Amino acid sequence: MARYTGPVCRLCRREGVKLYLKGEKCYSDKCPIVKRATPPGQHGASRRKPTEYAIQLREKQKARRYYGVLERQFERYFEMASRKKGVTGEVLLQTLERRLDNVVYRMGFAASRAEARQIVKHSHIEVNGRKVNIPSYLVREGDVVAVRESSREHKRIKELAAAATRTVPAWLSVDPEALRGTVLRLPNRDEIDTPVQEQLIVEFYSR
């Protein structure tokens, strides 16, 4: 399955929540979902009550799009989470939060996860002093994530560093001047602001 390349604001309207796929625009009044909260192509709210399957599917799609993960990748993350100790849904979200592109975004080094993926792919990021250009790389407790020395004069990265205002989660620490951050520990569920009900995702895959 190819990565979605269409208008990302339509995805937010489809899921009925902000997925923060468009960077700064998502934090402004220009966000389309503020103006039109109905799904794209639909004129007026549907009166049909969604089935249990449809509700579970929507929740899975919402999480997948929130993190920009392909279908097969998402299935692998669920399989990984189901084999670990703990509550499967919470472990799934924790695993998604550990993705390098998500951590780069959470640290404020990118305006969106899509931009974070590009920054990682273009070899602007290092982990523990070593270049890592794989967005799906899973960070661990104690890892130091930083913008590479050779990339610090990159125009877009300098703009982001100068405008950084996003609140950094408690499980991360960031030195914005050094363009470096540390994974203090793995996140707890109440520290993950992903707007999904993970139990519905577990139910979807448990059918």
Swiss-Prot record:
GO MF annotation, one: rRNA binding
Among InterPro entries, the record links this protein to:
Ribosomal_uS4, Ribosomal_uS4_bac-type, Ribosomal_uS4_CS, Ribosomal_uS4_N, S4_RNA-bd, S4_RNA-bd_sf
Q: Which domain of life is it from?
A: Bacteria
- Kindly state a single biological-process term from the GO annotations of this entry: translation
Q: Name one GO cellular component term.
A: small ribosomal subunit
Q: Which Pfam families match?
A: Ribosomal_S4, S4
- Report keywords, A-Z: Ribonucleoprotein, Ribosomal protein, RNA-binding, rRNA-binding
**PANTHER family from the UniProt entry:** 30S 40S RIBOSOMAL PROTEIN, SMALL RIBOSOMAL SUBUNIT PROTEIN US4M
Job of this protein? One of the primary rRNA binding proteins, it binds directly to 16S rRNA where it nucleates assembly of the body of the 30S subunit.
For this protein, the record's NCBIfam families field holds: PRK05327.1 (NF003717), rpsD_bact (TIGR01017)
Family the entry assigns: Belongs to the universal ribosomal protein uS4 family.
* Full protein name: Small ribosomal subunit protein uS4A
Q: Which organism is it from?
A: Symbiobacterium thermophilum (strain DSM 24528 / JCM 14929 / IAM 14863 / T)
